[in-house]
Amino acid sequence: MVTPCPTSPSSPAARAGRRDNDQNLRAPVKKSRRPRLRRKQPLHPLNPCPLPGDSGICDLFESPSSGSDGAESPSAARGGSPLPGPAQPVAQLDLQTFRDYGQSCYAFRKAQESHFHPREALARQPQVTAESRCKLLSWLIPVHRQFGLSFESLCLTVNTLDRFLTTTPVAADCFQLLGVTSLLIACKQVEVHPPRVKQLLALCCGAFSRQQLCNLECIVLHKLHFTLGAPTISFFLEHFTHARVEAGQAEASEALEAQALARGVAELSLADYAFTSYSPSLLAICCLALADRMLRVSRPVDLRLGDHPEAALEDCMGKLQLLVAINSTSLTHMLPVQICEKCSLPPSSK
């Protein structure tokens, strides 16, 4: 009997045998019939309206159109058409999440507040003044609305801007670039679809290059030591709104209307350098209390929720009342129509 020679490991027969064995050992893989795509909600950018120049806050400029480099407008890039009115959709409350994590998150954010609060941001700025800061933020506010960004993004933008101003002198001709860079950094933290660099540069009418923006972004991140998650007015407004509803001090619809009005008041205060001395939690509770007063809420929010001195609360409330009185027309462009009617604000001119 002739003994067959052993098959060489590299022979075709051996390779075929290994393939058969491998196929027997592998588990069958069920292939998806259709590709799984992430569901995207439609985003509705807003068209900011020009406001009169006699208000205390600088005019909210119309969002500039695309530059000559052919960059598309924010509305087209985000896949939506502008809403007919200036109001954003009213948020919804998540009371179960608040019950589970609300107090822990509040205690953590409150402890961080002093570390992230920029004081005397313009003390080291020979070329940047409170007026130029007001003009820049009055331009950035409608830009953030045109992109359909959240109020949290705007608050983080202002915090990043002011904290950088406390560390580094900025030339006047680079101040606008710092503004859009701060907006980009904030949006990367919060937004699912942040604006593209090309879009932001187009808003500056081609005054800056992509390399300049990227270089300044690196400088800002290094100066701030990559600590970017600052507690904001937006966070504290949401916390106080949930707290009053959970405690049975207000109905959900009533609390949400007060929160929307308080956001409008807080948005006005962001552009005013006089309010940088107040912490975000103090501003949030005062804006909410003023909103309750304007809406004639039967059970206004308790000012003691924020654990602030009474003198500081009265001082901040007085300045906010004056701010709203001077900028009542500007405030109508930030609010839903039904809220303007309830608090007797002048109608928005379309």
Curated annotation (Swiss-Prot):
Residues 28-42 have a biased composition (Basic residues). The keyword Transferase does not apply. CDD domains: CYCLIN_CCNO_rpt1 (cd20536), CYCLIN_CCNO_rpt2 (cd20722). Specifically required for generation of multiciliated cells, possibly by promoting a cell cycle state compatible with centriole amplification and maturation. Acts downstream of MCIDAS to promote mother centriole amplification and maturation in preparation for apical docking. It is found in: Cytoplasm; Nucleus, Nucleolus. Present in respiratory cells (at protein level). One of its GO terms (molecular function) is cyclin-dependent protein serine/threonine kinase regulator activity. Residues 1-89 are annotated as: Disordered. The modification Phosphoserine is found at S81. GO terms for biological process: cell division; cilium assembly; G1/S transition of mitotic cell cycle; mitotic cell cycle; multi-ciliated epithelial cell differentiation; seminiferous tubule development; single fertilization; spermatogenesis. Belongs to the cyclin family. Keywords: Cell cycle, Cell division, Ciliopathy, Cilium biogenesis/degradation, Cyclin, Cytoplasm, Disease variant, Nucleus, Phosphoprotein, Primary ciliary dyskinesia. Transmembrane segments: none annotated. This is Cyclin-O. InterPro entries: Cyclin, Cyclin-like_dom, Cyclin-like_sf, Cyclin_C-dom, Cyclin_N.
